Amino acid sequence: MASARRRRIKKKKQVISKKIEFRYRGYTLEELQQMPLREFAKLLPARQRRTLLRGLTPQQKKLAMKIKKARRLLNKGKEPRIIRTHCRDFVITPDMVGLTFGVYNGKEFVEVKVTPEMIGHYLGEFSLTRKPVQHGAPGMGATRSSMFVPIK
């Protein structure tokens, strides 16, 4: 009885420790990186697919050239610098995985390290343009009802 319980616990630990391989629509990261861009676009949701198939704007072409240059450096074993860009509407493709981008949010460049889970999203989704509101304690003059809050 006790040995069967120990075997079940051991089996659970083995399942938990097993690393799950990333897949996007049934394809591994290596398969996606070998795939041509038009073929990859067919796997994307409609909005991203349309964006890629319509072609790149001059700003996006410039960013694509920077990505190719950084990818070559990464393949040689050198660490590429952060790629700074204002282009928030660029769809994250498999060849961008592992690179670091500085995405402009209207005030500063937010550092975005691209992981496989980000494939198919836009760069701008990971660089928030608005700061989340952090409400403070109510004080005098905050609202009409705050006049009844005792002054410290």
UniProtKB/Swiss-Prot annotation:
SUPFAM superfamilies: Ribosomal protein S19 (SSF54570). One of its GO terms (molecular function) is rRNA binding. InterPro entries: Ribosomal_uS19, Ribosomal_uS19_CS, Ribosomal_uS19_euk/arc, Ribosomal_uS19_SF. Keywords: Ribonucleoprotein, Ribosomal protein, RNA-binding, rRNA-binding. GO terms for biological process: ribosomal small subunit assembly; translation. GO terms for cellular component: cytosolic small ribosomal subunit. Protein S19 forms a complex with S13 that binds strongly to the 16S ribosomal RNA. Belongs to the universal ribosomal protein uS19 family. This is Small ribosomal subunit protein uS19. It comes from Methanocaldococcus jannaschii (strain ATCC 43067 / DSM 2661 / JAL-1 / JCM 10045 / NBRC 100440). The lineage of its organism: Archaea, Methanobacteriati, Methanobacteriota, Methanomada group, Methanococci.
